[in-house]
Amino acid sequence: MLKLFRPGWGEGDARYEAGKAEAVYAAGLPAPAVHGVTQVGERFGIVYEEIVGRPLMESLQRRPWAVHETGRFLADLHLQVHRGRVPSLPRVEDRLTRAIARAPGLSENERTALLALLGRLPGGDAVCHGDFHPGNVYLTERGPIILDWMDATQGNPVADVARTAVLLRAAVLPQGMPGRRVVELIRRAFLHAYLRRYFTAAPPAPEQLDAWMAVVAGARLAERIPGEEKRLLALVQGTLCS
């Protein structure tokens, strides 16, 4: 399986991600094996083992009545990730700090408040995937495999849970999409089941979640995802003003 980077991304970018993926795989986490970095024309890429299976997202779409079961499954898999330790990974706090510093849409007071809030939140050394959602989980014969470790860090696992929650809460469905209302309801039910299972099984205090979600939402603004700004700012301001 070849992951090609966009034009303009260099060999160093490919080797950086490959190094993360190799470290995560060596730690025994459910990630694809890395077979090296290659170049195709002017683009660099990473050669991964071939993954034969289907995305968890497809399973959710085929079996919407099993939304709670699928949410619990994702939570159990996330708990497995958070039991991993990879000391070579960068700190999640550093990644969030850089993103908040350049995020558009924040007032300077909000930016300062988010950075101060981040500084008060407890740290940790758990592996954090950084982009953990049903589209990055594949169901295979040897069990679930998690793709796309480019944003992997180490830190407080609740930061990673918050990232997943923000991705699900802030994503905007296209206007006029058939069944849009139903999809929104399924997504909310999925998120509820995922969070309930995670915090039932894990020791971290769920009261940290709102604070981490505000910080993660502020950082997400730096990615400039079309249509998400209003929801992300609501998450930030709802916590800072409470």
Language-model segments: residues:
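Helix-rich C-terminal or lid/interface subdomains of diverse kinases
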Residues: L168-R169, Q175-S242
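Acidic active-site catalytic centers that drive phospho-/nucleotidyl reactions
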Residues: K3, E17, D131, D148, ...
